[in-house]
Design a protein with these regions (language model features):
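A ligand-binding cleft/hinge motif common to bilobed small-molecule-binding domains
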Residues: 89-95, 212-235
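An extracytoplasmic/periplasmic, membrane-proximal ligand-sensing/linker region
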Residues: 183-184, 286-309
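Extracytoplasmic ligand-binding site segments that recognize negatively charged/polar headgroups
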Residues: 36-37, 41-43, 63-66, 80-212
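Periplasmic-binding protein-like
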Residues: 110-113, 124, 156-164, 188-194, 198-201, 271-292, ...
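A bilobed periplasmic-binding-protein/Venus flytrap-type ligand-binding module shared by bacterial periplasmic
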Residues: 129-134, 248-264, 280-283
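Paired acidic/hydrophobic, glycine-rich loop segments that form the ligand-binding mouth/hinge
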Residues: 80-85, 200, 217-222, 237-238
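Conserved N-terminal structural module of periplasmic/extracytoplasmic solute-binding proteins
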Residues: 25-83
Length: 309
């Protein structure tokens, strides 16, 4: 009797295993997505994926820009993520070092030439922010360039992002190096950091928060944020610096995991490119693809790209 019970238990276990396999063997594991996107962009991406029927089939993990960039460079093709959205310059550097991304299998029509392994999702330009009220109250001249911000006249009145932790700061540094060369750019950056003092911010959004609050009169940040603030009636204006508005793009790519890769990863990347863009454009209104509407104030007239990105 005991032997018969054991046999029945074994048979039930086998049947359960077969049923489990029938129910789940054809299901792919969840796609792991790593991203440095801010909350608004992340929500637009997740909404696009969910509307495309991928709800519950992915894990979305958020990182800071520097944290994700370091992770990509350190882990290479051993990274857990199946899909990555990050600053394009990190992705290009990682691809050059590790050859870790698969060619995208879907077509898209970007306005600018792109490498075959990634497609742009967002674009941000750098600009100088001004709190017009604070500028007037402190009798400060309106700056026309980034170079102006190194003047002692602005000591204690500016806030800038820290190049060690913020990709927004990279836009500022690119403009300085392109216009003045590395040596003079270094001196100017030092002067700007001295002027910022305790208002040197690790987060790219930190300077915007300080200029909004009137803690400083001038800041450097992402242009579209100042445009939105001015439209909302805040005492915020922006200056397109004489050195030019450098642009930072963030792109999506798929990790090349060979035959063991998740087949849904490429489909999700395509969904982000095709259906997440309308939501992203509400936050980052710079057009990246053919057919996208161009708002007059969405892009400066002096957009530049660093030649050795």
């Amino acid at each position: 009797m005991k032997k018969q019970s054991t046999m029945i238990a074994c048979a039930l276990a086998v049947v359960s295993g077969v049923l489990l396999c029938l129910g789940g063997c054809n299901q792919s594991p969840e796609v792991v997505i790593y991203s440095n996107a801010d909350e608004e962009s992340r929500l637009a991406m997740q909404d696009a994926l969910d509307r495309a029927g991928f709800s519950g089939q992915y894990i979305f993990s958020s990182f800071s820009t520097s944290e994700l960039g370091g992770k990509i460079m350190a882990e290479g093709s051993n990274i857990e993520a199946d899909v990555i959205t990050a600053s394009t310059y990190y992705l290009e550097s990682a691809q050059q070092a590790h050859r870790m991304f698969a060619p995208l299998s879907f077509t898209f029509h970007a306005l600018e030439k792109t490498p075959g392994f990634c497609a742009p999702l967002t674009a941000q330009e750098g600009a100088i922010f001004i709190n017009t009220r604070a500028l007037q109250e402190n009798g400060l001249p309106r700056p026309a360039s980034l170079k102006d911000l190194a003047s002692p006249a602005y000591k204690g009145f500016i806030s800038i992002p820290n190049i060690r932790s913020s990709s927004t700061a990279w836009l500022m540094v690119q403009a300085l190096v392109s216009a003045y060369g590395e040596q003079e750019a270094g001196c100017l950056l030092h002067g700007m950091m001295e002027n910022a003092g305790p208002h040197l911010e690790n987060s790219g959004s930190g300077p915007l928060k300080k200029v909004r609050a009137g803690e400083v009169a001038i800041a450097f940040g992402l242009r579209h944020q100042a445009v939105a603030d001015r439209k909302a009636g805040l005492p915020i204006d922006y200056v397109d610096p004489a050195e030019g508005n450098f642009m930072l793009t963030e792109s999506v790519c798929v990790t090349d995991k060979g035959a063991g890769g998740n087949p849904l990863a490429m489909k999700m990347a395509e969904t982000l490119v095709r259906t997440a863009r309308p939501g992203i454009l509400k936050v980052y209104p710079v057009p990246l693809y053919e057919g996208e509407n161009f708002r007059e104030d969405a892009r400066s007239s002096n957009v530049k790209a660093f030649p050795n990105r």
